[in-house]
Amino acid sequence: MIVVHHEDTLLQDLGGGNTRRILAWNDDLMLVEVGFDSGTVGATHSHVHTQSSFVLSGRFKYTIEDETVEIGPGDSVIVPSGKLHGTVCIEAGKLLDVFTPARQDFITRT
């Protein structure tokens, strides 16, 4: 069993009004809270990981390839591996992102 207490996690300032907090992970799965100020952007990108984003709070325009939808609290999207995707925050909020396999590039080794 892996248990991660919130007080043991690190809030990372990504700049530009965005934050990231890795909540839990193993090699197969990663859970990440991503914060956005209103008007900030999650730049369009792709990766080999399958990703699901669940809206904890706020409103977002979420784009996968050439399709854009507006999502809010309780909504979720699934991004298949290798697909271009990004978001624009239209009301300050947080996403809960799940990646499989885990994003090793997010993990800071000390």
Give each language-model segment a name.
Residues 56-57, 72-73, 91:
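A cytosolic small-molecule/anion-sensing beta-strand core signal
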Residues 81-105:
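Ligand-binding loop in jelly-roll beta-barrel domains
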Residues 41-42, 61, 77, 81-86:
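Histidine-centered metal-chelating micro-motifs
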Residues 47-49, 75-76:
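Amphipathic, hydrophobic secondary-structure cores in small proteins
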Residues 32-46:
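Conserved short histidine dyad/triad with adjacent acidic residue
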Residues 1-28, 108-109:
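A short, N-terminal "cap"/entry segment at the start of jelly-roll beta-barrel domains
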Residues 66-81:
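Short acidic-glycine-tyrosine-enriched beta hairpin
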Residues 49-60, 65:
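Glycine- and acidic-residue-biased ligand/ion/polar-headgroup-sensing regions
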